[in-house]
UniProtKB/Swiss-Prot annotation:
Family the UniProt entry places it in: Belongs to the NiCoT transporter (TC 2.A.52) family. RcnA subfamily.
All ranges on the Periplasmic side of the membrane: 1-12, 78-86, 196-209, 273-274
GO molecular function, one term: monoatomic cation efflux transmembrane transporter activity
Residues in the Cytoplasmic compartment per record: 34-56, 108-174, 231-251
Gene Ontology cellular-component annotations: plasma membrane
Keywords: Cell inner membrane, Cell membrane, Cobalt, Cobalt transport, Ion transport, Membrane, Nickel, Nickel transport, Transmembrane, Transmembrane helix, Transport
Induction (free text): By nickel and cobalt. Transcriptionally repressed by RcnR.
InterPro entries: Ni/Co_transpt_high_affinity, NiCoT_RcnA
Protein name: Nickel/cobalt efflux system RcnA
Length: 274
């Protein structure tokens, strides 16, 4: 740490900006940062590449903002303040939002299936009544419109992959909220660098290094999210049974996301109780 501080004092750290970007990208590959959770979310909603980019950037923005808030708040509140003391609370808050999101995803899928079954029942009843009044072949023109259940996203995908979402789609605000939540866990390394720069009265340098680090992190998170979105599109084109699997995928995805939320909540609670 002493050698790095010397480099900062001499102003040579500008040379390490590309290195900070690379370190941020590599840091994003480490366990955590909600990569699995974000990929599961994108797959569950059959998200587009645009939505995947939005999700990754939102996580990066909140990740960077938390670094700044902790660094400045720590200096103002207490000199003994550490990132470790705030992390349990952030984990607990994130867990509540994540579990709520998982519950919403599960409920949304279940409601879509229930509405579809009710509509099918009403249609079959009307069609049966129509057959008693007229014995012609009118009924044969309607069977192709009602196959096995598809949620809103699957029906839209069958018509046009770029318009797969209807009125019950995941909104941009919901995607942003999920991404912002995923980035709430701070990075102690980035906080340390920023604190050193602030103490050395090199605020601009510290901000630049943190932004560079976050840019590298964004590259990783966006790549993971976009990869999940592209995978959904390609598999749907190549495998005819994808829609059958996809209609159940939201249940598994919501379960996975819920387990991640529970895991974060337990660790956050244990950290607070220490």
């Amino acid at each position: 740490m002493t050698e790095f501080t010397t480099l900062l004092q001499q102003g040579n750290a500008w040379f390490f900006i590309p290195s900070a970007i690379l370190l941020g990208a590599l840091h994003g590959l480490e366990p955590g940062h909600s990569k699995t959770m974000m990929a599961a979310f994108i797959i569950a909603i059959k998200g587009t590449i645009k939505q995947a980019v939005m999700l990754g950037l939102a996580a990066t923005i909140s990740h960077t903002a938390v670094v700044w808030l902790i660094a400045f708040g720590g200096m103002v509140i207490s000199k003994r303040f550490t990132a470790q003391s705030a992390e349990p609370w952030l984990q607990l808050i994130s867990a509540v939002i994540i579990i709520s999101t998982a519950f919403w995803m599960f409920w949304r899928t279940w409601r879509g299936e229930r509405n579809w079954l009710e509509n099918m029942h009403e249609h079959d009843h009307e069609h049966h009544h129509h057959d008693h009044e007229d014995h012609h072949d009118h009924g044969h023109h309607h069977h192709h419109e009602h196959g096995e259940y598809q949620d809103a996203h699957a029906r839209a995908h069958a018509n046009d992959i770029k318009r797969r979402f209807d009125g019950r789609e995941v909104t941009n605000w919901q995607i942003l909220l999920f991404g912002l939540t995923g980035g709430l866990i701070p990075c102690p390394a980035a906080i340390t660098v920023l604190l050193i720069c602030i103490q050395l009265k090199a605020l601009t340098l510290g901000a630049t290094l943190v932004v560079s680090f976050s840019l590298g992190l964004a590259l990783t998170l966006v790549t993971v999210s976009v990869g999940a979105a592209i995978s959904v599109q390609q598999v749907a084109k190549r495998w005819s049974g994808f829609n059958t699997l996809a209609k159940r995928a939201p249940y598994f995805s919501s379960l996975l996301i819920g387990l991640v939320g529970v895991y974060m909540g337990v660790h956050g609670f244990m950290g607070i109780m220490r």
